[in-house]
Amino acid sequence: MIIGQKTFDTEHHTYIMGILNVTPDSFSDGGKYNSLDAALYHAKEMAENGVDIFDIGGESTRPGHIQISDEEEIERVVPIIAKLKTEFDIPISVDTYKSNVAEAAIQAGADLVNDIWGLKYDEKMAEVIAKYQTACCLMHNRNNTEYNNFIEDVLDDLKETIQLAKQAGIEDDKIMLDPGIGFGKTYEMNLEMMKHVDSIQTLGYPVLLGTSRKSMIGLTLDLPADQREEGTLVTTVIGMMKGCSFVR
């Protein structure tokens, strides 16, 4: 898979996407890095620790989050993306489901669009990604948790997302998929997805797994968000053992 100027050997390696939320309210690091200097310092820490991709988020996607305007999100993410582009030779992802934000981020230097709605929230998102031939991570998500056959339904939903990408002209080697742990799923469904996360690979694209500090871990271990490091590591290793090419 090609992201920016780098080729990722997704069949033989697992790569790390480092989270950098420039938000006041993200549940894992909200408020810590919402100044340019603090964000840049954290990016340097991640680079020193071997991160392969920076993932920049300007709006929290935690349960109950408050949606912000496109303009405010752009004001949050564009300065840090532009700065990272000049400081590091590391691909940059923008975590957004809004096409206006994605386009501004790409123009500032983003190499990948990480869309938690898999092209289904903003009908112009696929067009923007195709226009710039940017890489994309397309996540499974739903507004409800009503499934007939959970794993099969998730695969069918992702097939719809892939079709949207293809219709827009997004090339196969620009696509990765995310099973969407913690999004549109109950606690039990999240556990089942962890058990069968390798099923996502049958669709023919690299898979990204993101479990960092999520409620599934908290409910299993009865721990608050700031004490879920070990659970995050365990679920990440499970994903690696099951063939995930990227972990977030």
Residue ranges and their predicted role:
Residues M1, D9, M46, V51-I53, ...:
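Active-site loop-to-helix "anion-binding N-cap" substructures in soluble metabolic enzymes
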Residues M1-P24, K166-I170, L223:
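N-terminal amphipathic alpha-helix/helix-capping segment at the start of soluble metabolic enzymes
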Residues I3-Q5, S28-D37, Y41-H42, T61-K83, ...:
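Active-site-adjacent loop and "lid" segments of alpha/beta metabolic enzymes
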Residues I16, N21, S26, F54, ...:
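Conserved, well-structured ligand/cofactor-binding cores
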Residues K44-E48, K159-K174:
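Phosphate/pyrophosphate-binding loops at sites that engage ATP/ADP/AMP, CoA/4′-phosphopantetheine
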